[in-house]
Amino acid sequence: MALALIHPSKRAYSLAPLNLKEELQGFKVQGDRKGVGQEPLCKQFRQLRYEESTGPREVLRRLRELCRQWLRPETHSKEQILELLVLEQFLTILPRDLQVQVLEHHPETGEELVGILEDLQLDRGKAGEQKDSAQRSRPTVLVGEPAPRREAREQPGCALPQKPEERGKETRSENGNLIAGTDSCGRMESSCTMTEPIEAQCEDLSLKKNPAMPKEKTNSQCLETKERLVQNSGLIEHDRAHTGEMSWESVGSQSSVAADHQEISKDKGHPCQECGKVFQRSSHLIRHQKIHLGEKPYQCKECGKVFSQNAGLLEHLRIHTGEKPYLCIHCGKNFRRSSHLNRHQKIHSQDEPRECKECGKTFSRALLLTHHQRVHGRSKRHHCNECGKAFSLTSDLIRHHRIHTGEKPFKCNVCQKAFRLNSHLDQHVRIHNEEKPYKCSECNEAFRQKSGLFQHQRHHHKSKLA
């Protein structure tokens, strides 16, 4: 039976949820897979060996099992399985360095993978152009020649002091002035009248060669402001203020900044036609366009909530599974999102709690205090249609609605008990894990909930609390 194919341009928006992140992790370099336990199913299917099984029937059964676990035909359509196979083979034939760079962006469709590769090729081309331009702009230096002599070679009218063995014949007039001379190779060197800036540069070069020689103070006068300067080199720098001339150092630095700015503006070359937002990579633009199209192909099988990106679905599934992969190294507490862990870690770095000036309530983080202060400064504009109760935040109204609807989206994986709030599920899971994080500082008795610790302290340590 032939597979029904769809156009590649539409496939990126019409595919149902594919949990590609799990499959794509199998293509990472072995050096990046430290600490990973089980091999991905696609690699187990590809690398199964006949010698590892007891017989041909066992090999066939194992291959069918691995293929079904990998492709999941009971949940995926033919188009989805085809897309998964094409994407897997595409990643397999990529060079190793490109595999690593592509997997950092977590492509979800073949179109996104192509967009990522095109962006990488564009970046490599720009890097090569920058390297070539840097080599072309680098000044040519004569090897084996001292720096002062190279500077003098660039100034034809400036002659360096010659060594005795290098001096040729010199022709002088009757009054002793040098008319022409020959160098050690026999070439004629004609005299010329040097301008004042070149004389100043020759003077600086002679001082570099003979640092012990005292430098005479010469009074130079600016023709514009009649200001007198001690050295001719100072007059050169002073004249640039009137003429607007820039030294080669400042010109080079400003041109490099302008070039960097142009490169940045070139990178942002993928604008959204709907809202005008610009993206550096075409793959990012493809993901962003799903917002305007209203496409939410990734649906949660537990509660039916839909998402525009597969990453959002994977993050949402942690609510139902109870998975909290982000661990705080200070207190051992786990979190579902990395942003929650970052906010939590600020508790350990702060010594003093933050207090609300309106009601005196204290908070461990400034963000919680800001969130709480909205209660005092904002009117309760969100009313419940069932009981008329008002709330200042829409999130509080949504949580309150679950009381009337009876919705309990947070389910325990062990006993299947459902809860209205995620915090209630966290407290319930401690029963199965036998976790008691709240410990009495007086007698070291532990409790699962903070309220149990408070009741214990009021009854058994009432005198010490007073």
Swiss-Prot record:
Species of origin reads: Mus musculus (Mouse)
**Positions of region (Disordered):** 124-182
The family database entries (PANTHER family) matched by this protein are listed as: ZINC FINGER AND SCAN DOMAIN-CONTAINING (PTHR23226), ZINC FINGER AND SCAN DOMAIN-CONTAINING PROTEIN 23 (PTHR23226:SF76)
> Where is this chain compositionally biased, Basic and acidic residues type?
124-135, 163-173
Record domain SCAN box: where: 42-124
> What is this protein identified as?
Zinc finger and SCAN domain-containing protein 26
At the highest ranks, the source species' classification is:
Eukaryota, Metazoa, Chordata, Craniata, Vertebrata
The record, for Gene3D superfamilies, names: Classic Zinc Finger, DNA breaking-rejoining enzymes
- Report the protein's function: May be involved in transcriptional regulation.
User: Cross-link Glycyl lysine isopeptide (Lys-Gly) (interchain with G-Cter in SUMO2) maps to which residues of the chain?
Assistant: 21
ZnF locations on chain (C2H2-type): 220-242, 270-292, 298-320, 326-348, 354-376, 382-404, 410-432, 438-460
* Matches recorded under SUPFAM superfamilies: beta-beta-alpha zinc fingers, Retrovirus capsid dimerization domain-like
